[in-house]
Amino acid sequence: MYVVNGQKIYIGSHHGADRYWTIAVTDPKGKRHQNVSWFMIDASLPGITTQPLYMLSAQSEGETDEHGHKNIIFFDNVRVPADCLVGGENNGWKVASTHLEVEHSGQGNIRTNPVWTALLAHCRTQHRDGRPLIEDPDVRAKLAEIFSRLEAVRLLSTRNFWMVYAGEKRSYEGSQVSYLRKTTNLWLTKAIIELLGPAALTNDPVLGAIDGMAEAQQRRGIVEQHPGGTTDIQRVVIARRLGVGAREPQQAGRLGEEGMARKTAQPVEA
């Protein structure tokens, strides 16, 4: 039996889940990456509180899609059976690393970006100075650049998806796609403004463009810099996997004990 305390923010996107994948510190004095354990905790256990978190990328308050709605989970002396431990005590980082590799395009999210599809249709049907936008050489050049960047991310995601299901060992590939997707999404916000002007900054049904998707991308491009590790973290992972990172292990930045909101799991007798 373990007693879990603490909280976690930005939890999603499957709202109303029956189980929570949870990583918690099980050896406070242990070395980094060797002091945490992974649990699959029953969401109905006493002491668990879930609060919705509506983010900048939400279309409106109360939205429940994966982009705009996450959760904050609180654990208050939650008694967790030992058989909820996954991978053995203090092996949580190994389990988490596998989970992150799946998150970094191993889950099969390889469709064409819907923002691109809507943007292309808009430029084909909307007119400026009496002719379709797509007939403007500058517009065509920008569309070509947008497609090339988004397609590069999609193809690399497809490669990673294949590697997972072919049983191929991956190294830097997961973080590579995560880094490119984040930086491309942020770049896309500016590219859309260059194409659509002020219409890209409002979701007004009359003044906005592509059914509000352009404005939503402005917010989503910022929010998507965080999940699964920031761009700086992805670059560190890539460097380490390629063997060009720091030669000596470096201590990660830490908050003061009063500012820490980490989860801890203390073993107790059932």
Regions found by a protein language model. Give the residues of each.
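Alpha-helical interface subdomain recognition
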Residues: 1, 72, 101-270
